[in-house]
């Protein structure tokens, strides 16, 4: 049996290794929850044996050394980390310690914030002008990232307002919204570039680029949460007051910051944020709870590595470790072949996970994945579970290579990968049963033709029994034929037939989306429908004409043009129209004749809307004569900013474009 000294040495060595991977290499090998568990184990042993604590123990310092490639900045005030709690009992114990330590009987109020999963930074302003920025590094010395921080549009280069201190060091978190993260990885997969495991790694990798021009292309954003150096000026005597003052000076502060009057209110805040977490649009891993009074903070003071007046209340882990049993290959509606890891089932964020996407061959190569490997699985919100990385230090001896198929696993057709694309595709088209199934499932889905009651299992049976080959065949189905399907009685069959009949009356935009043209989502379909007005005009459009539609570039234009150039696709459309699929004739909208504040304007929506869905908002805006675009440019007239608006809002502010919130949008929609 190992001695206590040996256990301590092994734990410290393991933690130092993972700190190096996390802080220096930006390539963590284990989940945060596993790191937290190891740290707790080390703390418990050191608490029982204080005589064995060493100055270089991971419990005695904050972080890890900065990268040598950057020059260094020494923090005038150390950037400490926070202690963690993981359950209500631990938080209530922290609350009691705070109450017991305070010498006065004054009431304690708490300032509660989101614990953003990004990169902590320090930004120094002198006379209101940004002069330097640094990472936290080891808490004493960080990396000079001034040039990169200056590219982040959410961070003001000059503060505005009155009574700005001569020297003010603002601290906060640089992070990457989920939409930006997905776009970066989507682009990387298409071009064969580096794919990031999660938004935190993407933010760190983007911020620590030696070339600021690369950082500038990444949609990073920032929220401030505290202050370091303060000279030649004053700040309010509460933490919340300071954050509100920062906001007045032009610094971004999360609108979820909340003042809680009691421990019970803190717990309610925690559970509300946990409930809202999937809809925030960016990653968090808990909430941060701080004593609001600066005077009380001073009374409480610090321990060696963290303040006594604050704590991070972390959510259940979204990452766990498990083993890959096998890798199988699925075929999508456009023929894309996606490798899927079959896992030893593991609970991640409260859900039992047994499968995880591997995206494509490049991702398997990037991960260095082999069948039998121990891997880290991540599940965030409603996102499909993903393999974050392979735990190479624990690779079994009997792992097997993952062999990507050269022929479709469903129909046997050749698999091809177009140069410049990361995705390999089955060339079988509609002769491939898998593509046929997925195309039909998309066609009847709620946001497409919206055929109520026609679920995936019905589509699977219809294809397997050869009842349906194209979307037009769906409208030829009879109740008698449907009754022959498994678990389909006469009444259910008639309901499906009725739903198909009802679905024949649709909109041009829904019809285009239902066709499943590559790269044409709902917003693009709506833009095409609004711009061309009729199917005939769209079918006849050249690639150059298609690019005149907002947010349609050369890639999307080529896919649309090629789709309508294919005779088989035109035949299916003709059959659908012959079966009675139709939509209202286009109403020619003259923006000058519409009495609407949105008429003739190019509008961009950003952030989360709480009163109506984004799709409904887009539809109403188009009805009132607006053109809804997906990105902000000099051509944009108006930006509507919901909650957690990020880089689009920052760009709009930089360009001087008018910005309104959801409340104002609803007022104008009703006017």
Curated annotation (Swiss-Prot):
<keyword id="KW-0460">Magnesium</keyword>
<dbReference type="InterPro" id="IPR003583">
    <property type="entry name" value="Hlx-hairpin-Hlx_DNA-bd_motif"/>
</dbReference>
<feature type="binding site">
    <location>
        <position position="290"/>
    </location>
    <ligand>
        <name>NAD(+)</name>
    </ligand>
</feature>
<dbReference type="InterPro" id="IPR041663">
    <property type="entry name" value="DisA/LigA_HHH"/>
</dbReference>
<dbReference type="Pfam" id="PF12826">
    <property type="entry name" value="HHH_2"/>
</dbReference>
<keyword id="KW-0862">Zinc</keyword>
<feature type="binding site">
    <location>
        <begin position="81"/>
        <end position="82"/>
    </location>
    <ligand>
        <name>NAD(+)</name>
    </ligand>
</feature>
<dbReference type="Pfam" id="PF14520">
    <property type="entry name" value="HHH_5"/>
</dbReference>
<dbReference type="InterPro" id="IPR036420">
    <property type="entry name" value="BRCT_dom_sf"/>
</dbReference>
<dbReference type="Pfam" id="PF03119">
    <property type="entry name" value="DNA_ligase_ZBD"/>
</dbReference>
<protein>
    <recommendedName>
        <fullName>DNA ligase</fullName>
        <ecNumber>6.5.1.2</ecNumber>
    </recommendedName>
</protein>
<dbReference type="InterPro" id="IPR010994">
    <property type="entry name" value="RuvA_2-like"/>
</dbReference>
<feature type="binding site">
    <location>
        <position position="136"/>
    </location>
    <ligand>
        <name>NAD(+)</name>
    </ligand>
</feature>
<dbReference type="GO" id="GO:0005829">
    <property type="term" value="C:cytosol"/>
</dbReference>
<dbReference type="Pfam" id="PF00533">
    <property type="entry name" value="BRCT"/>
</dbReference>
<feature type="binding site">
    <location>
        <position position="113"/>
    </location>
    <ligand>
        <name>NAD(+)</name>
    </ligand>
</feature>
<dbReference type="InterPro" id="IPR013839">
    <property type="entry name" value="DNAligase_adenylation"/>
</dbReference>
<dbReference type="GO" id="GO:0006281">
    <property type="term" value="P:DNA repair"/>
</dbReference>
<keyword id="KW-0235">DNA replication</keyword>
<dbReference type="InterPro" id="IPR004150">
    <property type="entry name" value="NAD_DNA_ligase_OB"/>
</dbReference>
<keyword id="KW-0520">NAD</keyword>
<dbReference type="InterPro" id="IPR004149">
    <property type="entry name" value="Znf_DNAligase_C4"/>
</dbReference>
<dbReference type="Pfam" id="PF03120">
    <property type="entry name" value="DNA_ligase_OB"/>
</dbReference>
<dbReference type="InterPro" id="IPR012340">
    <property type="entry name" value="NA-bd_OB-fold"/>
</dbReference>
<feature type="binding site">
    <location>
        <position position="314"/>
    </location>
    <ligand>
        <name>NAD(+)</name>
    </ligand>
</feature>
<feature type="binding site">
    <location>
        <position position="173"/>
    </location>
    <ligand>
        <name>NAD(+)</name>
    </ligand>
</feature>
<dbReference type="InterPro" id="IPR001357">
    <property type="entry name" value="BRCT_dom"/>
</dbReference>
<feature type="active site" description="N6-AMP-lysine intermediate">
    <location>
        <position position="115"/>
    </location>
</feature>
<keyword id="KW-0479">Metal-binding</keyword>
<comment type="similarity">
    <text>Belongs to the NAD-dependent DNA ligase family. LigA subfamily.</text>
</comment>
<feature type="binding site">
    <location>
        <begin position="32"/>
        <end position="36"/>
    </location>
    <ligand>
        <name>NAD(+)</name>
    </ligand>
</feature>
<dbReference type="Pfam" id="PF22745">
    <property type="entry name" value="Nlig-Ia"/>
</dbReference>
<dbReference type="GO" id="GO:0046872">
    <property type="term" value="F:metal ion binding"/>
</dbReference>
<keyword id="KW-0464">Manganese</keyword>
<keyword id="KW-0227">DNA damage</keyword>
<dbReference type="InterPro" id="IPR013840">
    <property type="entry name" value="DNAligase_N"/>
</dbReference>
<feature type="binding site">
    <location>
        <position position="432"/>
    </location>
    <ligand>
        <name>Zn(2+)</name>
    </ligand>
</feature>
<feature type="binding site">
    <location>
        <position position="411"/>
    </location>
    <ligand>
        <name>Zn(2+)</name>
    </ligand>
</feature>
<dbReference type="InterPro" id="IPR001679">
    <property type="entry name" value="DNA_ligase"/>
</dbReference>
<dbReference type="GO" id="GO:0003677">
    <property type="term" value="F:DNA binding"/>
</dbReference>
<dbReference type="InterPro" id="IPR018239">
    <property type="entry name" value="DNA_ligase_AS"/>
</dbReference>
<keyword id="KW-0436">Ligase</keyword>
């Amino acid at each position: 049996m190992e001695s206590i000294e040996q256990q301590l040495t092994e734990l410290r060595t393991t933690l130092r290794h993972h700190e190096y991977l996390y802080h220096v290499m930006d390539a963590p090998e284990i989940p945060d929850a596993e790191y937290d568990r190891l740290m707790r184990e080390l703390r418990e042993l050191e608490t029982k044996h204080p005589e064995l604590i060493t100055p270089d123990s991971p419990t005695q310092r904050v972080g890890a050394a900065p990268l040598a490639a950057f020059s260094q900045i020494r923090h005038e005030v150390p950037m400490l980390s926070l202690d963690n709690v993981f359950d209500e009992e631990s938080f209530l114990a922290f609350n009691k310690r705070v109450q017991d330590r305070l010498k006065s009987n004054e009431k304690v109020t708490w300032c509660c914030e989101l614990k953003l999963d990004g990169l902590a930074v320090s930004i120094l302003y002198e006379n209101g002008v940004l002069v330097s920025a640094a990472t936290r590094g080891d808490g004493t010395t960080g990396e000079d990232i001034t040039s990169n921080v200056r590219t982040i549009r959410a961070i003001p280069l000059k503060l505005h307002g009155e009574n700005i201190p001569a020297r003010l060091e603002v601290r906060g978190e640089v992070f990457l919204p989920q939409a930006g993260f997905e776009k970066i990885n989507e682009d990387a997969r298409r071009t064969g570039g580096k794919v990031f495991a999660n938004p935190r790694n993407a933010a760190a990798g983007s911020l620590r680029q030696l070339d600021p021009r690369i950082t500038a292309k990444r949609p990073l954003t920032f929220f401030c949460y505290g202050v370091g150096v303060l000279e030649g000026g004053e700040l309010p005597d509460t933490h919340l007051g300071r954050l509100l003052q920062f906001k007045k000076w032009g610094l971004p502060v999360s609108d979820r910051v909340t003042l809680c009057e009691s421990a019970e209110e803190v717990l309610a805040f925690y559970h509300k944020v946990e409930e809202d977490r999937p809809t925030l649009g960016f990653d968090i891993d808990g909430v941060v709870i701080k004593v609001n009074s600066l005077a009380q903070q001073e009374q409480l003071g610090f321990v060696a590595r963290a303040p006594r007046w604050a704590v991070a209340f972390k959510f259940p882990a979204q990452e766990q470790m498990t083993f890959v049993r096998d890798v199988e290959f699925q075929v999508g509606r456009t023929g894309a072949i996606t490798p899927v890891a079959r896992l030893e089932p593991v609970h991640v964020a409260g859900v039992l996970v047994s499968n995880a996407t591997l995206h494509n061959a490049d991702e398997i190569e990037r991960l260095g994945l082999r069948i039998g490997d121990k891997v880290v699985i991540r599940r965030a919100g409603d996102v499909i579970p993903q393999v974050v990385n392979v735990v190479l230090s624990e690779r079994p001896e009997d792992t097997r290579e993952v062999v990507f198929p050269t022929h479709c696993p469903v129909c046997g057709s050749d698999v091809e990968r177009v140069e410049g694309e990361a995705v390999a595709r089955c060339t079988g088209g509609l002769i491939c049963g898998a593509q046929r199934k997925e195309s039909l499932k998309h066609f009847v889905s709620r946001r497409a033709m919206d055929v109520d009651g026609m679920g995936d299992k019905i589509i699977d049976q219809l294809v397997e029994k050869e009842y349906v080959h194209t979307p037009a065949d769906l409208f030829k189905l009879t109740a008698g034929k449907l009754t022959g399907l498994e678990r389909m009685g006469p009444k259910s069959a008639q309901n499906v037939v009725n739903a198909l009949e009802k679905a024949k009356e649709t909109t041009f935009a829904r019809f285009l989306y239902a066709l499943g043209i590559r790269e044409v989502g709902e917003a693009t379909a709506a833009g095409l429908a609004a711009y061309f007005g009729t199917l005939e005009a769209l079918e006849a459009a050249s690639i150059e004409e298609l690019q005149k539609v907002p947010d349609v570039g050369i890639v999307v234009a080529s896919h649309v043009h090629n789709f309508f150039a294919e005779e088989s696709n035109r035949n299916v459309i003709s059959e659908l129209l012959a079966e009675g699929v139709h939509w209202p004739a286009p109403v020619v909208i003259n923006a000058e004749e519409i009495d609407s504040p949105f008429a003739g304007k190019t509008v961009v929506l950003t952030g989360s809307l709480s009163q109506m869905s984004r799709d409904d908002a887009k539809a109403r805006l188009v009805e009132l004569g607006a053109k809804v675009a997906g990105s902000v440019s000099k051509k944009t007239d108006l930006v509507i900013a919901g909650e957690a608006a990020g880089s689009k809002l920052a760009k709009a502010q930089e360009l001087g474009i008018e910005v309104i919130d959801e409340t104002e949008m609803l007022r104008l929609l009703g006017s």
